[in-house]
A protein has these predicted regions:
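Loop-to-helix entry region at the N-terminal start of transmembrane alpha-helices
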Residues: 7-18, 68-104, 188, 192-196
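Transmembrane alpha-helix signature in integral membrane proteins
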Residues: 8-36, 151
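Membrane-embedded alpha-helices of multi-pass transport/permease systems
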Residues: 28-33, 92-95, 99-121, 151-159, ...
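Cytoplasmic-entry segments and transmembrane alpha-helices of multi-pass inner-membrane transporters
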Residues: 33-68, 97, 107-114, 121
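Glycine-rich helix-loop "coupling/hinge" segments at transmembrane-helix boundaries
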Residues: 68-69, 160-190, 195-196, 221-222
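C-terminal transmembrane helix and the adjacent membrane-cytosol boundary/short C-terminal tail
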Residues: 80-81, 85, 95, 111-114, ...
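Short helix-to-coil transition segments within interhelical loops
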Residues: 113-143
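Transmembrane alpha-helices
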Residues: 132-164
Length: 226
């Protein structure tokens, strides 16, 4: 660690930064997309088919697939490189992991909305609520623990997935694992592996506790649960 202290700090920051960017974007896109898939059955089948197909592709293969269109675009439009969009590095890693995160969050949203008791929706309509108000004031509070559970699965999977980015030049903690394997240096491998494991267990623990706290608060307030 002493030898690679500065490099470790940079790689650690890159690793966490990529994971959070992927999951935040996944939530911003996935929550409304999951709601749309639930409200429109035909579109929901198309969305589900696309996301299930992407989910079935191995991580490294999907990252490599992303490299081709991104390389073409960055060569065709050179200004994209000035904004960090290229066929190697962070962009293909982000795009691939974003697709996986989207799968988890959309599925969580869709599955949770399906089991919301219709009597609460009907009661909200009877009070004159709009579709948006029903979603934000009725459905979201009911399914919030399920959404957070989906985010938990997505975040832990993304932290692991960022590791693979080292194979195409992204400098996360996977860089130490790859470097250690190439040099048969177990200490360097562990320098990358242990922090990744620690992050996975930490995020999993924190988000599980958050779900428990929300459930306790809901019981105190008398809010229904899925």
């Amino acid at each position: 660690y002493t030898t690679y202290q500065k490099q470790f700090a940079e790689c650690f920051g890159n690793h966490i930064g990529m994971a959070f960017k992927v999951v935040v974007c996944g939530v911003v896109v996935g929550v409304p997309l999951g709601w749309y898939a639930y409200k429109h059955a035909r579109a929901g089948k198309v969305i589900s088919t696309i996301l299930n197909t992407i989910e079935s592709i191995p991580s490294l293969a999907l990252i490599c697939v992303m490299m081709f269109p991104l390389s073409f675009l960055s060569n065709r439009f050179p200004f994209l490189k000035d904004h960090g969009i290229a066929g190697v590095g962070a962009t293909p890693v982000f795009c691939a992991l974003f697709c996986y995160a989207l799968f988890q969050i959309v599925n969580s949203m869709y599955g949770a909305l399906k089991v919301v008791d219709k009597q609460y929706i009907d009661a909200a309509r009877g009070m004159g609520m709009t579709v948006r108000q029903i979603f934000t004031k009725v459905e979201i509070p009911i399914i919030l623990p399920v959404i957070i559970s989906g985010i938990r699965v997505s975040l832990t999977a993304t932290v692991l997935g960022v590791t693979i980015g080292s194979y195409i030049g992204y400098g996360g903690l996977g860089k130490f694992i790859l470097q250690g394997l190439n040099g048969f240096a177990i200490d360097i491998v562990m320098l990358g592996t242990l922090p990744i494991m620690g992050l996975v267990f930490l995020f999993d623990f924190v988000l599980k506790k958050l779900v428990v706290l929300i459930e306790i608060h809901r019981k105190a307030k008398g809010v229904v649960k899925v």
